[in-house]
């Protein structure tokens, strides 16, 4: 039994490993990959590898994998990538997985500067990429620095502005918050709708020469062939829609395109290498086929896919609405719980205040009672002292009377009697003064006792009011709420007929306008970002593409206006113009 061959296929977000047989064809491997990732819109994609000479090459589906010039290593390395692009992502991409793969590939192209993107658009796209990864901005979850490990905008744009990494993140965070309510899948689609208006989006560029030997670029995309000057990949000069081309062929390095207009000459150019002509031919055939398919009724398979996608989208919207309803209910319960907790805390504080006032009133009452008792004791002592003094005074009066009688009855020495009389008179005066002081003290103590008694009565009334005040209302706890969450040596000449039956006049792509032009919100966001970034821009670091883009903007040109302009005139006139470049 032949030894199996190990193969590794890298998609934009995963690595897949398979073991294939030596006779496995490219289509069998491709089918195995798309089945594994659940992709049905297979016509946009292909398997890319690096050949023995170091050139990126698309795997031929009709040949054995082992018979193609895949670099010999174990495992064999392939990239699963978009080979062809839709004209309008919003109209054509059906499956979410298809949108995601395009989103990741286009984002990588913009961040690596393979697709030129002006600064203001880069920041807006960065915010959609953040919405696509993180969902709605939530300041509780998305703390400062949550974008620290994310590649958000091209390094070129960062180098051209005097802003720190944190300042870039702050700007993108502000715009991230603007996208609140947008589903992750919708954010990816919005990203692509803006990105598809970039001048270099979806274009394969090839170096060519015209008959004069002028170095030019050939751009192959979903709408046709465009010719660019060597120093300007943003602004095509001549365009040929697929509906004007009936045959493409090459002989060695010479490539010939035959227009449908029989009066027009062949469109001839030269590529530097034979393998480039092979790639051009493959891309022309594939893009022309898709161009035709888009202009015909959908096949049964595509109709079924679109119906299924609509049903899935409707189901997601229902689930989203249910989640939003559940989220709002949960937030309402949380708010009610927080409100009740606040009310509980307020009531507890009021209760503590009542208790503190009661304690203070009781202490004040106790202190006043003590003061009243003390005053009463002082009053009694003063009264007793006054009584003693009164008794002494009366005794002195009696003694005086006795002496006066003795003075009358006895004959004594006048001097002795006078001396004794003077002594008793002085003593009586002293006792009289002491009696008056004690009487004043008694009156003062009686007044203070009365004041203390009045304070005691007032305090008892206040305490009675506090103790009889209505208690604070009871605190209700919230109800518990649970939320569940080949080589070409076979020959050097190949030719392909491109049928354009029924679509000769169908060039509605020329009527398109940019997303910014038809979406006022995007237009407003881009204008705001342009104004913000202009203040931090270092004009000395503008690149050649920046200068070209700004000049196009100044002249009012965009991708679709340029497309209309470069297709003006008949086919012969445009071919003559190409030859004259």
Swiss-Prot record:
On this chain, the residues bearing Phosphoserine are 366
**Is Phosphoprotein one of the keywords?**
yes
Among the GO molecular function terms of this UniProt record, one is:
actin binding
Gene3D superfamilies linked to this entry? 1.20.5.450, 1.20.80.10, 6.10.360.10, Phosphatidylinositol 3-kinase Catalytic Subunit, Chain A, domain 1 (3.10.20.90), Pleckstrin-homology domain (PH domain)/Phosphotyrosine-binding domain (PTB) (2.30.29.30)
Positions of post-translational N6-acetyllysine modification: 60
Give the Phosphotyrosine positions (modified residues).
146, 354, 476
Name the GO cellular-component terms: actin cytoskeleton; actin filament; adherens junction; apical part of cell; apical plasma membrane; basolateral plasma membrane; cell cortex; ciliary basal body
Q: What does this protein do?
A: Probably involved in connections of major cytoskeletal structures to the plasma membrane. In epithelial cells, required for the formation of microvilli and membrane ruffles on the apical pole. Along with PLEKHG6, required for normal macropinocytosis.
Which stretches are tagged as biased composition: Basic and acidic residues?
308-341, 535-560
How is it regulated at the activity level? A head-to-tail association, of the N-terminal and C-terminal halves results in a closed conformation (inactive form) which is incapable of actin or membrane-binding.
Modification after translation, per record: Phosphorylated by tyrosine-protein kinases. Phosphorylation by ROCK2 suppresses the head-to-tail association of the N-terminal and C-terminal halves resulting in an opened conformation which is capable of actin and membrane-binding. S-nitrosylation is induced by interferon-gamma and oxidatively-modified low-densitity lipoprotein (LDL(ox)) possibly implicating the iNOS-S100A8/9 transnitrosylase complex.
Which key words tag this protein in UniProt?
A: Acetylation, Cell membrane, Cell projection, Cell shape, Coiled coil, Cytoplasm, Cytoskeleton, Membrane, Phosphoprotein, S-nitrosylation
SUPFAM superfamilies found in the cross-reference section: Moesin tail domain (SSF48678), PH domain-like (SSF50729), Second domain of FERM (SSF47031), Ubiquitin-like (SSF54236)
Ranges for the region named Interaction with SCYL3 are: 244-581
**Encoding gene per record:** EZR
The name of this protein is: Ezrin
- Record localization: Apical cell membrane; Cell projection; Cell projection, Microvillus membrane; Cell projection, Ruffle membrane
Please list where the region (Disordered) is annotated: 306-341, 534-560
């Amino acid at each position: 039994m032949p030894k199996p061959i190990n193969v590794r296929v890298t998609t934009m977000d995963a690595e897949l490993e398979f073991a294939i047989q030596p006779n496995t064809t490219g289509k069998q491997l491709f089918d195995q990959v798309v089945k594994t990732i659940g992709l049905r819109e297979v016509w946009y994609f292909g398997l890319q590898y690096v050949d023995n000479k170091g050139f990126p090459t698309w795997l031929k589906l009709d040949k054995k994998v082992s018979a193609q010039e895949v670099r010999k290593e174990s495992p064999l390395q392939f990239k699963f990538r978009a080979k062809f692009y839709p004209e309008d992502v919003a109209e054509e991409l059906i499956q979410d997985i298809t949108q995601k793969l395009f989103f990741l590939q286009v984002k990588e192209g913009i961040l690596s500067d393979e697709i030129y993107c002006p600064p203001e658009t880069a920041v807006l796209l960065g915010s959609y990429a953040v919405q696509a990864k993180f969902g709605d901005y939530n300041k509780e979850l998305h703390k400062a620095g949550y974008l620290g490990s994310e590649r958000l905008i091209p390094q070129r744009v960062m180098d051209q502005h005097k802003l720190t990494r944190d300042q870039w993140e702050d700007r993108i965070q502000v715009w991230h918050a603007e996208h609140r309510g947008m589903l992750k899948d919708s954010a990816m689609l919005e990203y692509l709708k803006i990105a598809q208006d970039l001048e270099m989006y979806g274009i394969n560029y090839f170096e060519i020469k015209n008959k004069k030997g002028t170095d030019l670029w050939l751009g192959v995309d979903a709408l046709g062939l465009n010719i660019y000057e060597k120093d300007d990949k943003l602004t095509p000069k001549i365009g040929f829609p697929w509906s004007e081309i009936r045959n493409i062929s090459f002989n060695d390095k010479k490539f010939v395109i035959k227009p449908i207009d029989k009066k027009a000459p062949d469109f001839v150019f030269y590529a530097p290498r034979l393998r480039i002509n092979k790639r051009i031919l493959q891309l022309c055939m594939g893009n022309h086929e898709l161009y035709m398919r888009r202009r015909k009724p959908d096949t049964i398979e595509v109709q079924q896919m679109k119906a299924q996608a609509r049903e899935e989208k409707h189901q997601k919207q229902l689930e989203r609405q249910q989640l939003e309803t559940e989220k709002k209910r949960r937030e309402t319960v949380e708010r009610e719980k927080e409100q009740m907790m606040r009310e509980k805390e307020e009531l507890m504080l009021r209760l503590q205040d009542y208790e503190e006032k009661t304690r203070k009133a009781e202490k004040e009452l106790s202190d006043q009672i003590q003061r009243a008792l003390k005053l009463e004791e002082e009053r009694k002592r003063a009264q007793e002292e006054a009584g003693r003094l009164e008794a002494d005074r009366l005794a002195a009066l009696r003694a005086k009377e006795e002496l006066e009688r003795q003075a009358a009855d006895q004959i004594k020495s006048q001097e002795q009697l006078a001396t004794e009389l003077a002594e008793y008179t002085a003593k009586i005066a002293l006792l009289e003064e002491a009696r008056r002081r004690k009487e004043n003290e008694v009156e003062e103590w009686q007044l203070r006792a009365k004041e203390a008694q009045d304070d005691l009565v007032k305090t008892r009334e206040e305490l009675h009011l506090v103790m009889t005040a209505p208690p604070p209302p009871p605190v209700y706890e919230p109800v518990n709420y649970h939320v569940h969450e080949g080589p070409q040596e076979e020959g050097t000449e190949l030719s392909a007929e491109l049928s354009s039956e029924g679509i000769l006049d169908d060039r509605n792509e020329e009527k398109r306008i940019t997303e910014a032009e038809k979406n006022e919100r995007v237009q407003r966001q881009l204008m705001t970002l342009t104004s913000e970034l202009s203040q931090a821009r270092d004009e000395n670091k503008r690149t050649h593409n920046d200068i070209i883009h700004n000049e196009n903007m100044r002249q009012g040109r965009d991708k679709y206006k340029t497309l209309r302009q470069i297709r003006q005139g008949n086919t012969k006139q445009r071919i003559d113009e190409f030859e004259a470049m």
